[in-house]
Regions:
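C-terminal segment of N-terminal export signals and the immediately downstream linker at the start
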Residues: 10, 16, 38-73
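N-terminal secretory signal peptides
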Residues: 1-22
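N-terminal export signals
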Residues: 22-42
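Acidic (Asp/Glu)-rich catalytic clusters
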Residues: 47, 71-76, 91-101, 113-132, ...
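Hydrophobic faces of well-ordered beta-strands that scaffold small-molecule active sites
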Residues: 50-55, 82-84, 132-137, 161-163, ...
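Acidic-and-aromatic substrate-binding clefts and catalytic sites of carbohydrate-active enzymes
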Residues: 59-66, 86-94, 109-116, 138-146, ...
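Active-site acidic/histidine proton-transfer and metal-coordination neighborhood
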Residues: 27-29, 33, 128-229, 322
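Acidic/histidine-rich catalytic cores of soluble enzymes
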Residues: 191-289, 293
Length: 335
């Protein structure tokens, strides 16, 4: 307030002075409220993540029992994107048989489009405002049925297709990893012709030196950066003895997708992380995003800085999806 206002107040009757004081108090309160609102709005707009996705293997039993109810829950939580897991109607017979062999141990059998055709599944996702952006697909299917993969992917609006892991028999030696790098280049080219990007999700093996070479880096260095991309799982990367941030910085624009989860305490594979038994051993140490020891905010910052486009929460077969997945999303919305 300027001098003119002060001089006027000094000669006003008491009632007018009181009104003036009320005005000042009200104006201060209103201004403070607007400032607070502005700060909150800026905070909301400056959050590191806006469209957070979910890998559906986080709640496979729920999806198996009630697909529509599960998708509605996911949507109401605030998730926007999805990553699917197979097999699918277009999957190869080999992929389907391998899945059928393990479903008794898993306790569920639903996958892919959950008995819907691709068109109806897309309509169901649209109904709940969800977009499928990525899909894990069996290696054999990608090698033998890429045109069918491409047709389904275009119907769904997928951008990325890739494998969840390299079959164990194909990665026993460095030569095996080199052959996989060559195979990935071929798959990347096939995917590109279908308007897609091929991604490789590493499950934590191949992150330690073998004969003076790190297999994961061998694959990164021997694949075409225009054709082959990667999906980092920050839990399995850490369990394999590697630093997620170091890989993101060292290989900018190679990682298109990332799985976000947390680790209740720092743990590593009992051996080399090469088989499902070693993965299962570490599941008890998986926790909600933000509830563990991983530097989630810094990882997300470096991921965005270095080209990651899709961020998927994944909490493998978590016991209480409604609580766990909501907690992870709430944390990520506020970093």
């Amino acid at each position: 307030f300027g001098d003119y206002t002060v001089s006027c107040i000094l000669v006003q009757p008491v009632s007018i002075i009181m009104k003036r004081r009320t005005f000042i108090k009200t104006n201060f309160t209103l201004t403070s409220g607007l400032l607070l609102f502005g700060q909150q709005a800026c905070k909301s707009n400056n959050n590191l993540l806006q469209d957070i996705g979910l890998q559906l293997f986080s709640l496979p039993k729920m999806l198996n029992n009630d697909l529509r109810g599960s998708l509605e829950m996911i949507s109401k939580m605030g998730y926007k994107k999805l990553e699917l897991y197979g097999p699918y109607p277009f999957s190869s017979e080999k992929a389907i048989k391998e899945w059928e062999a393990i479903t008794p141990q898993l306790g569920f059998s639903g996958s892919g489009f959950f008995n819907y055709n691709v068109s109806d599944f897309r309509s169901l996702l649209d109904e709940y405002g969800l977009k499928a952006k990525s899909a894990h697909i069996h290696l054999h299917t990608l090698n033998t049925r890429m045109p069918e993969v491409g047709h389904a992917a275009r119907s769904l609006g997928l951008e990325c297709v890739g494998i969840a892991f390299i079959p164990e028999e194909k990665r026993k030696t460095l030569d095996g990893y080199k052959r996989m790098a060559d195979e990935f280049n071929v798959l990347g080219d096939l995917a590109k012709k279908e308007g897609l990007k091929f991604i490789y999700h590493n499950h934590g093996y191949g992150l330690k030196e073998q004969d003076d070479q790190v297999p994961m880096k061998l694959i990164l260095d021997n694949t075409d950066p225009e054709l082959v991309f990667f999906e980092m799982d920050i839990f399995w990367t850490t369990a394999g003895g590697a630093d997620p941030i170091e890989y993101l910085k060292s290989y900018p624009n190679r990682y298109l997708c990332i799985h976000l989860k947390d680790m209740s305490k720092l743990v590593y594979f009992s051996k080399d992380g090469s088989n499902p038994q070693q993965w299962i051993e570490l599941l008890p140490y998986m926790t909600n995003v933000g509830n563990g020891i991983l530097d989630i905010k810094q990882i997300v910052y470096e991921a965005k800085k270095n080209g990651v486009q899709h961020f998927f929460v994944e909490h493998d077969m978590v016991e209480n999806p409604k609580i766990a997945l909501q907690a992870s999303l709430d944390f990520l919305k506020n970093i």
